[in-house]
Each structure stands twice: as C-alpha cells, then as structure tokens.
From Swiss-Prot:
HAMAP family: Sulf_adenylyltr_sub2. Its EC number is 2.7.7.4. This is Sulfate adenylyltransferase subunit 2. GO terms for biological process: hydrogen sulfide biosynthetic process; sulfate assimilation. It comes from Rhizobium meliloti (strain 1021). Proposed to provide activated sulfate for transfer to nod factor. Gene3D superfamilies: HUPs. Sulfate-activating enzymes, NodP and NodQ, may be physically associated. PANTHER family: SULFATE ADENYLYLTRANSFERASE SUBUNIT 2.
Amino acid sequence: MSLPHLRRLEAEAIHVIREVVATFSNPVVLYSIGKDSSVLLHLAMKAFYPAKPPFPFLHVDTKWKFREMIEFRDRMARELGFDLLVHVNQDGVEQGIGPFTHGSNVHTHVMKTMGLRQALEKYGFDAALAGARRDEEKSRAKERIFSIRSAQHGWDPQRQRPEMWKTYNTRVGQGETMRVFPLSNWTEFDIWQYILREEIPIVPLYFAARRPVVKREGMLIMVDDDRMPIQPEEEVTEQLVRFRTLGCYPLTGAVESDAVTVPEILREMLTVRTSERQSRLIDTDEVGAMEKKKREGYF
C-alpha cells in the first residue's frame, strides 16, 4: 500500500518524537493500549530502530479496563521488550472509587487524572507523549502538538504557542511540563490505513464478535466482569459488536458491526458520520467535559 500522505504523517510524527528526546531530559509515552497508542508505540520503535526507545511507556491503570486490554498490554511489553510502567492511584483504590459507585466524572478525575499527575511527579517526567488527535473532539482540535502544562499539570488554551513551519518551542519554566501529541494531524481513517499498511497489532475488541452487552443511557455497554450491576429492567444479550474507542469498560459503548478485519473497518468508516468519542461517557458527563478535564491535568 503506497499512500504519500501516510508517509508525510509518519515523518512528522517521528520528527516530533525525536525532537522530544533531543530537548527534554526525562520523557515518557502515555500508553493507553488503544489503536492510537499502538500506532504511537510502532512509531517510537521505528524512530530509534535498531535501538529500543530511550524512554519508558506509562499506563495509568484505573482497574476498570477491559480484560483483553490488560492482556494485550502485557503481551506487547513482553514481545517488543519496551520499558513498561504501570501506575495505580492507590488512594482511589482504598476509597473504593469506581464508575458505578461514584459516577464517571469522579472516577475519571481520581483514577485517571490524579493517577497521571501522581505518576508524572513520582518519576519526574518533564514531557509526556500521547496519541490524542485533533479530529477526535473539539477541545483537542485547538490544542498544539507541543502543549505546555503548568506546575499543577493544568492546561491553559491562552498560553499555547504558535507552531509555524514545523518549528516547536519546547522550553518550559520551573515545575512546568509538556504534553506532546505526535498524531495531532492524523484522522481516525489515517490511523486505520496506517495499521493496515504496517500490520500493527491491536486489541481484538476493535473487531466485531458476539459479546454480552446491556443497553444503558443509549449505549451498548459490554459486561466484562461480575462487578457490573445489572438493573431489573436491563437484559444482557449477545450481540455482534465492536469498539471504535477503548477506555474503562463501564464507560465505553460498543457499536453494532460485522467488521472483522481492518479492510472491513475502513469500508465501514466510509459511511460513518459520528466521532468515535461519542461512545465515551466521560466526554459527555457535563458541559465542556473534555476541556475541563484537560485543564485539571487529563491527557
């Protein structure tokens, strides 16, 4: 598959990754295990081949990820040999914080946002690369590739710096850090084309299969373990579904689909008119949800 635009996107992303290594003393990749993280992992491996990437990969584990995601994470770390760090907010675990008991907003803030902030401070990382893209969500659409964060890890859109002619300002003040998004200019379709071209392994949840789901708040939520309470009016049914995006399983909706290969997913996407993140409850639990979370230190 020869697609010139994919070569340009790949070159830009590798340039950004190398720029981070050249200008920061202690960078890390935020590895959330999804398709974008898989592409970012692949690009990082390419950027420094035959050497290993000169930075670790950090997964902030909320303890509510799909089981297949955790199995995939551990398998990739074994097979590729990259340095994997897993951080859990133990304060949240001790308090029993979860999506069912405390709601999506509190769960995400404590287990993801605060967990990430804890990990960045624990290891002293000054730059964190992540796989967010501008086409995913409106607050991400206005964020720069190099996104400066305050000493409290907050994002202020008014402090963003111009990025003209692929020239990046990587300087940070005392206590400040940088979030870096090498895939900013990619689209969901680009991601899948690149996965096809490069034969990148991804979590099987992206492919259609018969899975146990319940319909809740207009979404098909997969019953991944026995911690999920089933309401009296709800019925668990086996349906042919897949996921366009992955997160904590109680907060991530599946879509009805029969696409079981990457080419079939690409064909399916030609008819899709909604964002992949419309099936993420954390993006809709309040007005301006994603921007508010980013201002508090979210990815």
